[in-house]
Amino acid sequence: MVCDVKDLKIYYEIHGEGTPVLMIHGWSPDHRLMKGCMEPVFQTVNSSWKRIYFDLPGMGKTTGAPWIKNSDQMLDIILDFVDAILPGQPFVVAGESYGGLLARGIINKRPETVNGLLLLCPVVENEVTQDNGGKFQVFEKDDIFLNGLSEDDRNYFKAEGINSIQNQRVWQRYTDEILPALRIADYSFLGNLSGRFSFNADALEKPFMKPTLMLAGRQDFIVGYRGLWQLIDRYPRASFVLLDKAGHNLQIEQDILFTETVKEWLHRVETEMV
C-alpha cells in the first residue's frame, strides 16, 4: 500500500488487527528488517496487534525528496504518516538503530499518544557516545560457507562491526531481511541527510511512564550500549537487556532471547492498557 505524505508516497504494509504497533527500521535497510524479526514474535502471542511496517524516504520502496535534509523533517513525515493511517489513535512504537532515534522523537513530541516503546540497538546521542562500548568481535565463523559466497556477498556479510556470528543461519536471514534493502537504498539521498535532530529527543518534559524495552548488543560496534544505559532514568518502566554474542544485528544473532524479551514487553504493554 501507499500513503501520500506531502509530495511523498510512503510504502507500507499492515498485518493483523488490534492495538497498532508502528515499526521503524534503521538507516539504509527497509521494512523487511522489522518485519523479519517481529512477525515471528507476533505469531507466538494470543493477543491482537495491528503491525504497521513502512519504508522511510530514500529506503526500500519509498523514494526520497531533495527537500528532506535532516531528521527533524524525517520525524515530521512520520508524524504525518501516523496521522493519515491512525488518525487520533494511540499506538505502540518499535524502532531499530536510526529508527530508535526517530521513535524517541515521537515520544518527545507526542508522549500522550504512545503506549509502549521498543528500542532495538538504537542510535543515541549523549555525552558517552564517543566511548560507547561495543567492541566488535566475531564469535562464530564458518569459513567453508563464507568461501562459497561471491566476493561481493562476503564483503557485505563480513563488514566490520556488523555480524558477530558469520554462518549460514545468520546469512540466510541477513539476505532475506537486510541485504536486499542495502543494495537499493538511495545513498546519494542519505549522504545529504543529517542523521541528527536539532533537539535532544531524550530531554523529555517528564519521564516516559509506559512499558519500555531497551535491547543492546555487547559487541555492537555501530551504536554501542553505554549511551543507551544513560537514558534509563528517563524511561522508568524500561527493561534494559544487554546481550553477549550480539552485534548490531542482535535480533538475528540472538533470535531466541530477542523473541522472549519482546513477548514479555508486549505482555506488559497489553496488561497496562486493560
For the regions a language model picked out, list residue spans one by one.
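Conserved alpha/beta-hydrolase catalytic His-Asp/Glu region
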Residues: 128, 133-134, 148-206
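Short beta-strand/loop motif that positions the catalytic acidic residue
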Residues: 208, 214-216, 220
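Conserved alpha/beta-hydrolase "acid-adjacent" motif
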Residues: 221-227
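Catalytic histidine-centered segment of alpha/beta-hydrolase-like enzymes
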Residues: 246-255, 259
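Active-site loop/oxyanion-hole signature of alpha/beta-hydrolase fold enzymes
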Residues: 52-94, 260
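Gly/Ala-rich beta-loop-alpha elbow adjacent to hydrolase catalytic centers
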Residues: 95, 99, 103
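Conserved HGGG/HGGXW glycine-rich cap/lid loop of the alpha/beta-hydrolase fold
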Residues: 8-63
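Flexible "cap/lid" loop of the alpha/beta hydrolase fold
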Residues: 104, 108, 114-148
